[in-house]
Amino acid sequence: METTASVVAELNVALGTDYRLVRQLTGGLQSTAYELTGGVVLKWTGDPAWAPRVRRAAELVRRARAVGYPTPAWLAVGTTAAGSPYQLQEFVTGSAPTLDQALARQVIEICELQRDLLPEDHDVSWSGWSHGVVFDGWDGVWERVQRYDGEAAELLARYGALCRPYRDHELPHHDLVHGDLNMGNLLAADGRITGIVDIEAAGGGARAYDLVALAASAARDGADAGVDELFLEAALRANGRAAVAVCAAAGFASVAEFVHTRSEQSQDMVNHGGRRLLELLDA
């Protein structure tokens, strides 16, 4: 069975390097991050199915950084002999902030850099996934959450009603979408955003997806008052109400399922974020 130590040893052989493990970093949910010597961060996952997505994300990181999007540079991308994908990134100083309105406005400006970064068409985008989850039963997420007891299913029904007029609406596909943008994936130091991490799920879609996710995170994760509303207003300006509604609904369904087997507190926090977005959308 692979361990972080064995992955470091293997990539040292492959790359001709001498990295050593320093510590596990906090933040980020898609795969665990580790600081190595030499100002380098290792991220890896034991799921070989993630390898194509990681390789695709490497190109999107390059594009994003070229326009000033502050995600760390990727230094190397590869797979272990067992097929586990990994990437080496530059280490960026900072820690996950509690967002105030000044930092939130910085993040909104950063999200505007995502506009039209993927002019080419893609087989699957975050907009396509969101529409499919809400209207076409993709992955079975919507149906599973509908069967839950308690508030999550009630909120999902409200999201379904909110989205109903937009079934035939074409959502934007050409923005860069981070795909998991929340307060835990931001880094800040000295009053400024220094990094956006955990970007392996990046793809095309509507940048409103990320702004809506930030609004929900702000509501549930303790941001200053009004920050959630700033993000939602930015999402509406970016891509309009149809995209915001469908992205919010799909995002809520996905996160509600993610926390369903976790603590009651986690479920309550997710429900609070989902409820707050509905309130802001008058739905």
Indicate where each model-derived feature is located:
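Structural motif at the C-terminus of the N-lobe alphaC helix and the adjacent alphaC-beta4 loop
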Residues: 60-69
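Active-site activation/catalytic loop segments of kinase-like enzymes and analogous catalytic loops
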Residues: 208-240, 249-267, 275-276
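ATP-binding glycine-rich loop module of kinase domains
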Residues: 30-53
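ATP-binding glycine-rich phosphate-binding loop
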Residues: 16-35
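Juxta-kinase regulatory segment immediately upstream of eukaryotic protein kinase catalytic domains
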Residues: 1-17
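Catalytic-loop of the protein kinase fold
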Residues: 176-178, 183
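A cross-family kinase active-site recognition segment
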Residues: 72-83, 91-155, 161, 167-174, ...
